[in-house]
């Protein structure tokens, strides 16, 4: 990452336990090196063992990745960055509306059979990424399931988690795959309005639909990271972490960009 990116993200890094007097040994590596190594892996799509010699050993980098995943540190770091990006765009740190969508991707041979499936609608064998973004396309919550899990089935748990983590959100836009009882369930159980954005009968071919395109653009952003071109992770939790790392890179660059004069 550039010096400008490091300056932007360094104050947002989670504080190690030993610095807070909660025990543990001082970390024997530079956080910037570790972040660079993981960003390189996610962007380039390399395997862990193919980590270049310029970075710390692949075992140490993977241990860092695993520790941040297991202790929720990547979630914490990602969410702090998102809040800063929103504020830089003149928004409140916490959003009030979101967009839900799902994407099926092929799975590599490293993905266990019990966590993969076949999406009959998209004709894709593998896993499915379920996301909710804010109106800027920034990730709020993510869940990775087998591809045969229906959008509505995964949405209930995803939206419940969204409501728990982001109490200000009262409106979520969705496509026609989320119709049915889910709309009433969200209203009655979560006090959340799920608004379905549908195509009209006079629409033919590719049409950019209001609101829905935001989440679709986020999926396009993710696919720019070669590690996410298909799912290579053994654990679904690792897939979710890689998605967050991809967004961390995008948000870091966004924060480091020079702001136009007079822009708020």
Residue ranges of predicted features:
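Short alpha-helical elements
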Residues: 1-264
């Amino acid at each position: 990452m550039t010096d400008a990116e490091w300056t932007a993200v360094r104050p947002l890094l989670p504080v190690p336990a030993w610095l807070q007097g909660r025990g543990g040994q001082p970390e024997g590596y530079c956080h910037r090196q570790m972040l660079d190594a993981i960003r390189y892996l996610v962007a380039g799509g390399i395997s862990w063992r193919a980590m270049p010699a310029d970075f710390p050993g692949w075992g140490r980098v993977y241990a860092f990745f695993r520790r941040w995943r297991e202790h929720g540190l990547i979630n914490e770091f990602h969410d702090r960055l998102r809040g800063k990006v929103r504020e830089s765009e003149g928004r409140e740190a916490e959003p009030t509306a979101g967009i839900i969508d799902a994407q099926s991707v092929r799975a590599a041979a490293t993905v266990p059979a019990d966590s993969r499936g076949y999406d009959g609608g998209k004709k894709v064998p593998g896993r499915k990424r379920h996301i909710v973004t804010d109106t800027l396309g920034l990730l709020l919550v993510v869940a990775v399931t087998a591809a045969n899990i229906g959008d509505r089935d995964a949405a209930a748990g995803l939206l419940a988690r969204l409501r728990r983590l982001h109490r200000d959100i009262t409106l979520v836009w969705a496509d026609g795959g989320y119709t049915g009882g889910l709309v009433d369930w969200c209203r009655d159980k979560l006090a959340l309005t799920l608004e379905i954005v549908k195509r009209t009968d006079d629409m033919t071919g590719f049409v950019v639909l209001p609101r829905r395109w935001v989440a679709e653009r986020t999926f396009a952003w993710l696919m720019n990271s070669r590690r996410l071109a298909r799912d290579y992770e053994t654990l679904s939790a690792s897939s979710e972490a890689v998605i967050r790392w991809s967004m961390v890179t995008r948000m870091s660059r966004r924060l480091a960009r020079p702001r136009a004069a007079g822009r708020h």
